Amino acid sequence: LYRETLDEYLASYDEHTAKIERFDKRIEELSSQERYCEKVKKLGCFLGIRTHTALSLIVETGDFERFAKGNIYAAYLGLAPGERSSSDNINRLGITKAGNSHLRRLLIEAAGGICKGAVGHKSKDLRQRQKDNTAEVIAYADKANTRLRSRYYRFLRHGKRRNVAVAA
């Protein structure tokens, strides 16, 4: 009986693994289409963002120009900090979580890439992804990566929990 159950679990695992590989291949095909290719390459210059996350950001956000500032986009994702204030009493809260939960989850997972490595360090994988982009895009992404890593480590030094530092 145990052997049959284990065999059933293994067959299910193999089936799901094959399905994930098919979806990943399809995502790679979509990302190489002309209308997505350039944007996916640019977003890939950031730490933690690979094809799936970049394509999801592009497709689900649509036109990034509709957001005048980054804080408006953060509110759209539910990553903006909440606040409960009255008169002189100001209470700052965590992220609102009122927004696109799928993109928020993807960006929080992508932020895990910031947690690894020293400030200013580039992995071989990141260098490879940045290779085909312009110097302006790479400089912008490097500046953002350095800022995010510095901010993460600063939060940790000041005693914030890791998950709070990652989301910030």
Predicted features and spans:
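A detector of single, family-specific signature residues
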Residues: 1-168
